[in-house]
């Protein structure tokens, strides 16, 4: 494990190093919540945990700055638990193994947790610092952002006192975000009665892996391969041409991550197994050709394994309906933002497919900065899966964050950034969900901006943070806090 705690600025890296030692996958936050409360007590920082699982910290103003506007520093404590197929990492119990790789910090075949651990580490650095000049400061460290923004959604009104919100969950240094997409979770389910497999049939497990995957918002515009969408094209052809039957399907594991791996078990007449192997080889060539220049095609694996024939499989009519619905389901960019060239407005991610044992579940995350188009896309999905006889439910909906280009904090941040870096910052809206929109719904008076150091490939085992961005990010934070105006 690389010793990252001595990297500069030590104030942030020391705290991030501590966070890597505490397991904090979404949905399993007891250890990190306890750690943050213990840390705050030891540091002499006022802190408490609210009913939604958020940790709130408070630090009084530097003497003489009590009349300044209050600043809320906000980040989320949970991390996406993704790992390479060969990794045995246990996210609920194991620390993250960090590696210094040139100008980057990464993990050993797992997500790093810099999303949003660096934001949390920055809050800790501000809270414990003795030499910073600032007005009243609060830290809001939210729970389970990655799986539905549950902490932000459960944030009580009246809990926070500040006037300005600095969200620390943007992943390109020098970009200052003033708008983000809304989102909605779509879940289609079906219970079915399995049928007996033909005892004379063979069974083959087909695996597709080695795709990049990635963040289903930030990286959806790159046209990366979705393992579920690639797999359904093969499965439909195998059913049509080789009399194959679907026994099970497992693809993807996070709504907000583009699936990089999918696996199906098919049964088919023994005399067709060789043809199936040839078909898989042909589809591998096709995928590599289609995604050459987008995917690392040398990493793509598409292969078969002979397995014991399962006792049951999906009934033919239900199988055909499911496969057709998955095939027809939209995935990727639906529309670009008309008013912001190069920015995705509306997209969806066919994230998780689980079929087998008499149950089918398909999970999708749709995003849009346009509320009407978000619901249009969600209803499109509902119609698609209703035709397959599935029950469709919407959950976890949150609105977009509408940009305010005349924001006072935006003007202030851009001024400080240019003074320190000698160039203009880039004002952006992002095609990803930020908690800002939800918090603004509860605290509409807040002046909000989001920024942070550069991270690459969040939500994947290739996640990494650029070391050289963290020092200028910290310098901006220190000057910004010292110059917050009076109320």
Language model regions located:
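Acidic/His- and Gly-rich active-site-bordering loop/insert found
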Residues: 3-103
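His/Asp/Glu-rich mid-to-C-terminal helical/loop segments that flank catalytic regions of hydrolases
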Residues: 158, 223-241, 268-273, 320-327, ...
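Zn-dependent metallopeptidase/amidohydrolase metal-coordination segment
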Residues: 4, 8-12, 338-341, 345-360, ...
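Active-site metal-coordination/substrate-binding segment of hydrolases
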Residues: 65-147, 152-163, 189, 203, ...
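Short glycine/threonine-rich loop-to-helix capping motif typified by GTGT followed
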Residues: 255-263, 309-317, 402-415, 438-442
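Substrate-recognition/cap regions that form aromatic- and gly/pro-loop-enriched pockets
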Residues: 343-432
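Midchain, well-structured core segments that form catalytic/ion-binding scaffolds
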Residues: 23, 103-106, 146-147, 153-367
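Active-site-adjacent substrate-binding region
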Residues: 219, 226-229, 233-249, 403-446
């Amino acid at each position: 494990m690389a010793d990252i705690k001595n990297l500069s600025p030590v104030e942030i890296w020391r705290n991030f190093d501590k966070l890597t030692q505490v397991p904090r996958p979404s949905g399993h936050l007891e250890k990190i919540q306890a750690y943050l409360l213990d840390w705050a007590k030891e540091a002499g920082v006022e802190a408490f945990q609210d009913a939604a699982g958020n940790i709130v910290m408070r630090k009084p103003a530097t003497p003489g700055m009590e009349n300044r506007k209050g600043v809320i520093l906000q980040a989320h404590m949970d991390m996406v638990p993704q790992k390479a197929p060969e990794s045995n990492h246990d996210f609920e119990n194991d620390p993250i193994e960090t590696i210094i790789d040139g100008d980057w910090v990464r993990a050993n075949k797992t997500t790093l947790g810099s999303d949003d651990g660096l934001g949390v580490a920055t809050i800790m650095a501000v809270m414990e610092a003795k030499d910073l000049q600032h007005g009243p400061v609060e830290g809001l460290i939210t729970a389970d952002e990655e799986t539905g923004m549950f902490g932000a959604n459960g944030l009580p009104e009246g809990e926070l006192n500040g006037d300005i919100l600095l969200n620390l969950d943007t992943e390109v240094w020098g970009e200052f975000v003033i708008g983000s997409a809304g989102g909605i979770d779509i879940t289609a389910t079906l219970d079915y009665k399995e049928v007996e497999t033909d005892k004379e049939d063979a069974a083959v497990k087909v695996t597709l892996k080695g795709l990049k995957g990635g963040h289903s918002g930030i990286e959806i515009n790159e046209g990366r391969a979705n393992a579920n969408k690639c797999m359904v094209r093969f499965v439909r052809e195998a059913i049509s041409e080789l009399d194959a039957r679907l026994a099970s399907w497992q693809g993807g594991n996070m709504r907000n991550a583009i699936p990089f791996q999918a696996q199906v078990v098919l049964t088919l007449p023994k005399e067709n197994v060789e043809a199936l192997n040839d078909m898989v080889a042909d589809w591998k060539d096709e995928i590599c050709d289609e995604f050459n220049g987008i995917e690392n095609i040398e990493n793509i694996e598409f292969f078969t394994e002979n397995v014991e024939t399962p006792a049951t499989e999906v009934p033919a009519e239900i199988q055909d309906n499911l496969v057709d619905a998955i095939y027809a389901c939209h995935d990727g960019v639906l529309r670009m933002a008309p008013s912001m060239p190069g920015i995705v407005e509306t997209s969806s991610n066919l994230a998780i497919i689980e079929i087998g044992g008499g149950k089918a579940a398909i999970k999708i995350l749709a995003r849009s900065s346009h509320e009407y188009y978000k619901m249009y896309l969600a209803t499109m999905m509902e119609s698609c899966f209703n035709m397959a006889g599935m029950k469709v439910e919407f959950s976890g909906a949150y609105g977009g964050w509408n940009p305010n280009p005349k924001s006072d904090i935006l003007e202030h941040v851009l001024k400080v950034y240019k003074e320190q870096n000698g160039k203009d910052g880039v004002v952006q809206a992002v095609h990803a969900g930020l908690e800002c929109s939800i918090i603004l719904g509860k605290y509409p008076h807040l002046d909000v901006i989001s920024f942070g150091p550069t991270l690459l490939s969040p939500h994947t085992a290739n996640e990494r943070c650029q070391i050289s961005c963290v020092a200028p990010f910290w310098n901006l934070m220190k000057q910004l806090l010292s110059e917050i105006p009076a109320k």
